[in-house]
């Protein structure tokens, strides 16, 4: 997933990038390794304990990031004001795309959980959008195979905001209305969903 995220965000020299739900930090590290000339990568997570794993992983690899404990739904103004060229939102989800590795999900997950996740995911997009510069791009990622957490969330968000949906094509998976769905594979590959949004410059 980290490889695909870096390909889709395509970080450029001098850019400020926000990893909004960053723990444990694998995707942030991959972005920093892909583009060592970023102006800044800000790694943000609501959990201080989980955020420490981001610090540990970046330090272990000799990488530099700005680490901030914050809820992506209500970012502090000092994060929002300079704006970001790109934002990664790898949001909390039902994890239905990784049931092969976590079979308990099939038993424990309830319908009400899916609705609550979808509400949280939409709130995260709402919270992040003001921090994205005009012309910037936001990559929405889940490890869910449920439309309620994927296309439905993006469509609901696009009804409320001026959004350009950018095309995604990968070597495997299925094109959806506003994103790309990778299904779990027999070889152990996880189920993932990606949607790439751009904020119009006008």
Predicted regions and their residues:
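S-adenosylmethionine
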Residues: 1-202
């Amino acid at each position: 997933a980290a490889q695909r995220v870096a390909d889709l965000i395509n970080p450029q020299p001098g850019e400020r990038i926000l990893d909004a739900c960053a723990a444990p930090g694998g995707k942030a590290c991959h972005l920093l390794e892909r583009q060592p000339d970023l102006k800044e990568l800000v790694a943000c997570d609501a959990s201080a304990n989980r955020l420490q794993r981001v610090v540990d992983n970046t330090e272990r690899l000799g990488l530099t990031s700005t680490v901030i404990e914050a809820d992506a739904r209500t970012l502090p103004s000092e994060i929002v004001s300079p704006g970001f060229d790109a934002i990664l939102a790898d949001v909390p989800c039902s994890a239905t795309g990784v049931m092969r590795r976590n079979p308990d999900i099939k038993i424990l997950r309830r319908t009400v959980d899916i609705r609550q996740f979808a509400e949280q995911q939409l709130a995260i997009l709402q919270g992040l959008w003001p921090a994205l510069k005009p012309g910037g791009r936001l990559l929405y990622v889940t490890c869910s195979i449920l439309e309620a957490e994927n296309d439905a969330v993006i469509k609901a968000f696009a009804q409320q905001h001026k959004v350009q949906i950018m095309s995604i094509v990968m070597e495997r998976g299925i094109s959806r209305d506003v994103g790309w769905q990778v299904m779990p594979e027999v070889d152990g590959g996880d189920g993932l969903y990606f949607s790439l949004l751009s904020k119009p410059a006008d």
